Amino acid sequence: MSIFIQLNNISVNFNNRSILSNISLALTPNCILTLIGPNGAGKSTLVRVILGLLKPNQGKIFFKNNLRIGYIPQKLNLHSTLPITVNRFMNLSYFNDKNYIQGMLSRINIIHLKHHPLQKLSGGEMQKVLLARALLKKPELLVLDEPTQGIDIIGKIAFYKLVNQIKNELKCSILMVSHDLSIVMANTDKVICLNNHICCSGPPETISKNSEFIAIFGNIGKNYLALYRHRHNHHHDF
């Protein structure tokens, strides 16, 4: 099996404090890997390591040559005194094919927003803009760090449905970081529960029975994982 990114015994320390301890995982083609864990578990730190933004104190990392990665951050901080439209934001990328950019805005159903200032967008609209920009390089791996934070339940469902459609179209892999157990798990192939170390990993139905997972998330998390596993034998209308 080909591998996009392989982490072997990765550890990260800040100020003599262990943030990540002996993390080993592999990101493979055409799969959805969901990373969950409590606040302070090291999820965002692990994402920075995977993106190559942070060098670990220990361990080895393997990246596929010329791996194309798209990234959607938790939040994009914009200064109110520097207004910028969606169209200008999209064109700030290295990608200079204007027709392709407009086509991507249409694909994500936000072409009507292209002249809107980013500061005026709703949370759901902003995440769609970030998704469109992340897709410009036709990523093999799409990394989403708490992508629906602050979005209402209907917006979350619509966003995850769109992401799953994109995944199927591009045949890309997705690394999802989230607390939204009730929704994110719907199409997840593998779950990793992180709390400084990897507590447990596997398909949702296996994780839901793990004692360390239950200790962190309780029976609410257990019920979410059991209830929302997608069996691919029905469809949803939104």
From Swiss-Prot:
InterPro entries: AAA+_ATPase (IPR003593), ABC_transporter-like_ATP-bd (IPR003439), ABC_transporter-like_CS (IPR017871), Metal_Ion_Import_ABC (IPR050153), P-loop_NTPase (IPR027417). It catalyses: Zn(2+)(out) + ATP(in) + H2O(in) = Zn(2+)(in) + ADP(in) + phosphate(in) + H(+)(in). Its EC number is 7.2.2.20. One of its GO terms (biological process) is response to zinc ion. It is found in: Cell membrane. It is an enzyme of class 7 (translocase). Pfam families: ABC_tran. ATP binds at residues 37-44. Keywords: ATP-binding, Cell membrane, Ion transport, Membrane, Nucleotide-binding, Translocase, Transport, Zinc, Zinc transport. SUPFAM superfamilies: P-loop containing nucleoside triphosphate hydrolases. SMART domains: AAA. PANTHER family: METAL TRANSPORT SYSTEM ATP-BINDING PROTEIN TM_0124-RELATED, ZINC IMPORT ATP-BINDING PROTEIN ZNUC. Belongs to the ABC transporter superfamily. Zinc importer (TC 3.A.1.15.5) family. NCBIfam families: PRK09544.1. This is Zinc import ATP-binding protein ZnuC.
